[in-house]
Amino acid sequence: MTLALAPTDRPYLPRGVRLVTDRVRGGIVLLAPEKAVALDAVGEAILSRVDGQTSLAALVDQLVEAYDAPREQIEQDVQAFLQGLRARMFLMVAP
């Protein structure tokens, strides 16, 4: 299985995985059973758009509109971030 996402893939958080506000540290955490990942601003910007309905291409389009960075760079960063989460079972993909 390849971890790369196709432009039409629709990433989503699997059952039991959710974004929560960590009131102690003042940030957003990706929480799963017995696992947690503190997110930086980039991770939060990406995952806040992951809903199971939005394709990878549309997600990248939204980020290109929101941030002043080249599309290719955003696409590479999003792909790498989501692949890492997918490898750790924090993310699933609907074709």
Swiss-Prot record:
Q: What is this protein called?
A: PqqA binding protein
What is this protein's function per UniProt? Functions as a PqqA binding protein and presents PqqA to PqqE, in the pyrroloquinoline quinone (PQQ) biosynthetic pathway.
Q: Which gene encodes it?
A: pqqD
Record Pfam families? PqqD
Molecular function, one GO term: quinone binding
Q: How does it assemble?
A: Monomer. Interacts with PqqE.
InterPro entries hit by this protein: PQQD, PqqD_bac, PqqD_sf
Pathway per the UniProt entry: Cofactor biosynthesis; pyrroloquinoline quinone biosynthesis
Native organism is Ruegeria pomeroyi (strain ATCC 700808 / DSM 15171 / DSS-3) (Silicibacter pomeroyi)
Name the keywords, alphabetized.
PQQ biosynthesis
Q: Which domain of life is it from?
A: Bacteria
